[in-house]
Amino acid sequence: MSDSSFRSMRMTRLVRPPGIPGIRKWAESNGHRVGRSGMIPPRVRQAYFAANPEVVEVVRVFAQDSGVGPDVYDWPDDGPLGPVYAIAFVRGLDEQEVLHRLGAEGQDIRLISDAEVAGHQGADGPEEIITIARLGNWVVAECKGRRGSRLEHVKALSIGGGEAVAVQRDRGAHDRFIYAVDGQVVTSFTPSRPFDRRGSDPDRLNGHLRLLGIDPTGDDIVDNAVPAALALASRISGVVIIDFGGNELPPHFADRFSGAKILNRESPRLGAVLGQ
């Protein structure tokens, strides 16, 4: 049941299989009187979804405050990490230990350039490439592949009193958000379905979810799911990943994220290339 007190700024759209008409066209064909614009009566919407159960309504969410929102992470598929990637935010470990717990041996660790990352096959090849950077108490590991979000790795990254937040983008069906503390998964969920949370304390991040426009007690399917999950990771860690040129943050970002730690991808960074 949705939290009746929850209100947010958001947009919805319908995801329809080929051949399924839109709601207005269906309504006209089935004797329901609706206008060409304006709101669809609730009874017509209910009838439409009952007749077309394969149609899904998804919600595009927005930050409800001036903090980090999904818009910051609306990256293109052809970005430096490609369509399949994992990003882990880790507190309590140094850079070498993060790479070690992700499976790297001493001889694997070296400096890696942005050009090498961009040219790497990632999840479609036999190896994955990882780069890391430290910002204050947190280390950010960017993996062109899936290693950084595997459950055993996320738990290992948090052992010893630390925290690890991992976000996996993997063509929708295998997207994942995991938050672990001291070796235990506190909460995890598929980013598009944040209502289905698992872990030792699945509701711990509900306050953050509400500020991202997500009702944690509702059943909305999130359209911009991975950007929202990355924004959630940023709110937990205080680290924001932004692609920009030069050494100074653009004024509109500097004003918006005052006090946040900004990761601008620098070349080269410490990293490793590991087998899948």
Enumerate the predicted regions with their spans.
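Defense-system signaling and execution modules centered on TIR/cGAS-STING-like, death/scaffold domains
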Residues: M1-S2, N52-D65
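Extended, low-hydrophobicity segments enriched in charged/polar residues
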Residues: R7-R13
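Short, Lys/Arg-enriched alpha-helical microdomains
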Residues: R36-V55
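N-terminal "first-domain core" detector
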Residues: D65-L111
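Short, intrinsically disordered low-complexity segments
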Residues: L111-A156, G160-P191
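Long, compositionally biased intrinsically disordered terminal regions
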Residues: D182-Q276
